Amino acid sequence: MLAVNYTNLRDNMKHYMDQVTDDYETMIVTRKNNKNVVILSEE
């Protein structure tokens, strides 16, 4: 499982979206106030 902060995700969106879909990874996006989000591939 990957973990990335919101700013890094925003700056490198294509890279992380490709990594999630190509490698079937699940990604946690860390945000302020512990309002984290999980991103996963639909496939």
Protein language model features and the residues they cover:
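Small, basic N-terminal interaction modules of short regulatory proteins
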Residues: M1-E43
